[in-house]
UniProtKB/Swiss-Prot annotation:
Localization per Swiss-Prot or TrEMBL: Cytoplasm
Catalysis: reaction(s): 2-O-(alpha-D-mannosyl)-3-phosphoglycerate + H2O = (2R)-2-O-(alpha-D-mannosyl)-glycerate + phosphate
Lyase recorded as keyword: no
Residues that, per the record, bind Mg(2+): D13, D15, D214
Listed name of the protein: Mannosyl-3-phosphoglycerate phosphatase
Catalytic EC class: hydrolase
Classification via InterPro entries: HAD-like_sf (IPR036412), HAD-SF-IIB-MPGP (IPR006381), HAD-SF_hydro_IIB (IPR006379), HAD_sf (IPR023214), MPG_Pase (IPR012815)
GO molecular function: magnesium ion binding; mannosyl-3-phosphoglycerate phosphatase activity
A single BP term in Gene Ontology: mannosylglycerate biosynthetic process
The organism's place on the tree of life at top rank: Bacteria
Upper taxonomic lineage: Bacteria, Pseudomonadati, Pseudomonadota, Gammaproteobacteria, Enterobacterales
NCBIfam families xrefs: HAD-SF-IIB (TIGR01484), HAD-SF-IIB-MPGP (TIGR01486), MPGP_rel (TIGR02463), PRK03669.1 (NF002976)
Length: 271
């Protein structure tokens, strides 16, 4: 097993995992965040959110300066002390937000798929959709390598849309509330593996990894973790992993930050 004293990295999704899906509250997780910070265990946020959103949340959570994974792995924000790494401060995978937007606009115009992207509306509308303040909602529009959208067509059309995106080298990914389009080469798992390898190179030892998530788009991340917490979520599909050995994977009874705390309690407090 593992302990909080050994080289360890914690990777965590945000909405529905570390943050409450509705209120964005994270206080139930605060004691564990403090304990991990005191033990110098990096908590690496991993989300579909933009890096601008996540840097704001990172500071709120007391995790500033650490690396993070934004836009479902298409963007890696490097740790403050990694300034000598090529690409600092951010590494972007695949094609840009602007290029993806052009593809989507073409598909919508020529093939009449029905969806609304965050680029189609203003920050006031996004604030209504999400419950965020307008200033925070504005940060959700600062995509660098993905597009977030609401699907407004049938399941059959979604299958056709997904196939067209795949033909064009893109992927269509479901998040907690919205859908995301990004380069097919990007992913939370690839981004996490890159960060793990970087820590290993800097320390000379591979860290043990623990990941926490609640939605289908967290599955690739949790697959590459040594240990995983599947936080009870709202998504009807849930999270399914290839290896669900109970010694490696814990499914929580609670949702959001309560479940996050439960997962940490399970893997650490009993050891």
């Amino acid at each position: 097993m593992f302990s909080i004293q050994q080289p360890l990295l914690v990777f965590s999704d945000l909405d529905g995992t570390l943050l409450d899906s509705h209120s964005y509250d994270w206080q139930p997780a605060a004691p564990w965040l403090s304990r991990l910070r005191e033990a110098n265990v990096p908590v690496i946020l991993c989300s579909s959110k933009t890096s601008a959103e996540m840097l704001y949340l990172q500071k709120t959570l007391g995790l500033q300066g650490l690396p993070l994974i934004a836009e479902n792995g298409a963007v890696i924000q490097l740790a403050e002390q990694w300034q000598d790494i090529d690409g600092f401060p951010r590494i972007i995978s695949g094609i840009s937000h602007g290029e993806i937007s052009q593809v989507l606009n073409t598909l919508r115009e020529k093939e009449h798929f029905k969806f609304t992207t965050f680029d189609d509306v203003d920050d006031a509308t996004i604030a209504e959709w999400t419950g965020l303040s307008r200033s925070q909602a504005a940060l959700t529009q600062l995509h660098e390598a993905s597009v977030t959208l609401i699907w407004r067509d049938s399941d059959e059309r979604m299958a056709q849309f997904t196939a067209r995106l795949n033909e064009l080298g893109l992927q269509f990914m479901q998040g907690a509330r919205f859908w995301h389009v990004l380069d097919a080469s990007a992913g939370k798992d690839q981004a996490a593996n890159w960060i793990i390898a970087t820590y290993q190179q800097l320390s000379g030892k591979r860290p043990t990894t623990l990941g926490l998530g609640d939605g289908p788009n967290d599955a690739p991340l949790l697959e590459v973790m040594d240990y995983a917490v599947i936080v009870k979520g709202l998504n009807r599909e849930g999270v399914h992993l290839h290896d669900e050995d109970p010694a490696r994977v814990w499914r929580t009874q609670r949702e959001g930050p309560e479940g996050w705390r439960e997962g940490l309690d399970h893997f650490f407090s009993a050891r």
